Amino acid sequence: MKHLLTVACLLLGQVFGPAEESPRLDQYTLARGPVVIGGVSQNASGLTYHAKRDSLFVVLDAPQRIVELDLDGSLKRKINLNKFDDTEGIVWLGENRFAVAEEARGNIVLVEFEPKDGGVSWKKATKLNTEIQVNATNGLEGIAYDPLAKRYFVAREKRSPAVFKIIPPKPESDAAPTAILMSLAGRGLRDISGLHYDAKRKRLLILSHESACVVETNQYGIESSRLLLRGGKSGLNRTIFKAEGISLDNRARLYVISEPNLLYVFQKTKSQPTDSDSSGSK
């Protein structure tokens, strides 16, 4: 029996490959930046990575707009958000679909646009009202998406900053989304300004500009590591001021944007070879 279990484990390892180790945030250091974001002068508010286009998408608060960027921060195109209000977060959902968070309205707005589209209408978009207590200065500030569970994560910015799981109703239902408070997520942070969910490794990244850090938690909100965004830490000469958006690409590079229009790129530092690695076989 033990022999059969061993063979089964070996076969599973060949099929799925070894479990991928999750790089801890405290292993990251600045690789590039600050870089001025192309086509943006102010109010960069949210960030997401589009894996199929290998692009970054940034949402602006004023004017209400999305800009698509190359990974170096250069502008590819602009998409106007017609009749949207107080847009503070964005997340890619797959294909040409995105979700945009409206801070004061407390809405998750579902939008879809083709590669050549230059605008999106709020009136024609599907809205999910989170029914989280928000106002013009303390509303939804970040959004992330779990494609496997098909649920969202949203953040309330400050004065009891918090992360909520948002479970949408079934397509045929008129019910409101279900909001579940993640009581452990972001505990001790002065505010929450951005979110990213890494579905591959089942971890949530929580950005705080007032606490100047990114916190890594598991899917239940329990912290496992953090990246410090202060001058003298993580390869930074100066503290990142007003960090507003965060995302990972498919190479595990970490992107942070800050107001008014700056982009920072962090990468995992190369591990130093151990004595056994350097000795090798002779």
Where in the sequence are the language-model features?
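Sequence/structural signature of beta-propeller domains
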Residues: 16-282
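Hydrophobic h-region of N-terminal signal peptides that target proteins for export
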Residues: 8-17
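Sec-dependent signal peptide recognition
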Residues: 1-7
